[in-house]
Amino acid sequence: MARIRFRGCPITQFASILPQQGANPPRAKGVVNLSTKKLGENSVLDTLLQSGSSKCLFPRASAQGLDAVLLNTAGGVTGGDSFRFTANAAEGTTLTLTTQACERAYKAQPRPYAQISNHLTVSSGARLNWLPQETILFNGSALDRRLQIEMDPDATMLLVEPLVFGRAAMGETLTDIRLRDRIEILRDGAPAFLDAMRFSGDLQAHLCRPHVANGAGAMALVVFASATAEGQLAPVRHLLPDTAGASLIQNDMLVIRMLAKTSFALRRALMPVLRRLNNDTLPRCWML
């Protein structure tokens, strides 16, 4: 059997394929920018730019709003990857954004983080639904994720960010991760909501503390900014499990925090709440 030589070394099943010292392995990068416009009574696509490992799909829908599905063709993120997404829901339009599958934060090298940056704007009289599926953290992952939403005073926004701590079905525990996560909502240019966390080290031990998460394997944040938010408080509380809570931080902003033992339990608890806050509809990607 012939052997191929590389830099003076034969390549066989025993050869090392580790990168040379100082080499920069290839990294995934993706960019999507999109905006909507009004066409008659319907919300339609106005502009779209996509490049690299980020793609956007637009399933056909009979509703008057525009649905967009984000796709990471790299299959996940790891240290050094960079993904940027921007979207603008123009005046009077409705835009629903989701992901084709769960995002996965894989084990990273010691130094670089995976970077995910999302920037959304909601114009006057518009509605934006930010409904990504779960982000799953793998042991050894390093993720820096930022979401900023800028709203006009009379805009409406529904947001969910579900986070899963390891693959429970495979017995994975997160004993070594790095996580930076920041969610910021601005209304009329002024800060209306800020949620930020940073962690490095043994997340499993931290989550097992009774006053932190009591061993939960997944969590979610839901924010509903709307003139109807106050009227949704009592009905939403009725739908929540014992490991979740809802409160009004402003008369027009409802915040829900939820813990669950597994990602399946989390989604099962989230779906009726999101349906309630989204006119009894959900993207088909969310179906169990």
Where are these regions (language model features)?
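N-terminal, charged/glycine-rich beta-strand/loop interface patches
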Residues: 2-134, 139, 275
